[in-house]
Amino acid sequence: MQEAYIVAYGRSAAAKAKQGALFHERPDDVAAKVLQGVLKRIDGKFNKNMIEDVIVGTAFPEGLQGQNIARTIALRTGLSDTVPGQTVNRYCSSGLQTIAIAANQIMAGQGDILVAGGVELMSAVPMGGNEPTNNPTLQYDDIGASYPMGLTAENIASHFDVSREDQDAYAVRSHQRAYDAQRDGRFKDEIIPIQVNSVEYTNAGPKVHTNIFDQDEFIRPDTTMEALAKLRTVFKADGTVTAGTSAPLSDGAGFVVLMSGDKVKELGVTPIARFVGYKAVGVDPKIMGIGPAYAIPEVLSLSNLSVEDIDLIELNEAFASQTIASIKEVGLDISRTNVNGGAIALGHPLGATGAMLTARLLNEMGRRPDSRYGMVTMCIGVGMGAAAIFEYVR
């Protein structure tokens, strides 16, 4: 069986939905710019038209993210029209699912060079899509399939005894870690700077300005327990979850390029990390945020590893309550988890998150010569969880 290696990675910076740097951009254009930057990072005798497929995840593949956006991205990237594209949707793990699909295809001998990643501009397609169509039977049966994500976060807080103070403290730490990382330039090598447009509205009419976007927009180093304590709960009158302990609506994109071991040798390309394993699981939709606590043991078992073997973990912070509960349930080491902050401070562009977290993980592993295994994991809407393991090549 072939091994699948990541040979390049990169992400956009994360932007505020509806008001940030990507508000005036198209999702396919943003993704194409990021992918172009990632492809430039591959050494050896690689040629972009050697790519055999472009697999792109998005949580809401409709409107500006519809029409098989993966194929559009491939063409906008400047790839040959012989390079196909497929769009994948597993909600919040879509960008990680594409990496698993590409890796498994390589391991099965069905390809040698594939692109995987994700894009989500929540500025372009709103949360829930343009026309939410929840199944009425599931809604009436009250199994949680139609619950707002914030309500499931409240359920997690109650079920796993996560206090308001615990959530606020976690959010403060996420912002502080992200601020420290940004200040120290730790995100620089994982972010692909892209050219974007901004619009200034004047009495003479709108003026378009061109800017370079390369800084995550959500980090607030001035976040304090006192400030968070003043926020009202959002999803339940007597609840504990606030906007300050939830991931903000975000825009972003991320990609990796995977290559078979044989092709790595043939082209003289430098491998970065080996794909070890991936697992997606289902959980009670009413407590969907606990998904990582079920996916992590499954992927560890599949990979013949223990939690102690994992040197770094990127656990998507959809909400502080579910992140804290998942960490406690699995027994993760907080000193190894989200070391540069997480989604509360860095955003969660849904279908792009898996690929963006993979870029963040590999970038940090590259800075730590003693790290070997890394993990990306997240909860998924409507009651699921996913986790993937990578081995850094030294």
Label the predicted regions:
Residues 11-13, 24-33, 169-266, 329, ...:
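N-terminal extracellular/periplasmic Venus flytrap/periplasmic-binding protein-like
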Residues 22-113, 119-135, 191-213, 286-287, ...:
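Conserved beta-ketoacyl condensing-enzyme motif
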Residues 27-43, 69-70, 98, 149-156, ...:
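Short, well-ordered amphipathic alpha-helical segments that serve as non-catalytic structural scaffolds
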Residues 25, 58-111, 132, 143-151, ...:
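Conserved catalytic cysteine-centered active-site region
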Residues 1-27, 224-290, 294, 301, ...:
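Condensing-enzyme catalytic core mediating Claisen C-C bond formation in acyl metabolism
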Residues 12-18, 104-160, 221, 365:
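Glycine-rich loop/linker segments at domain edges
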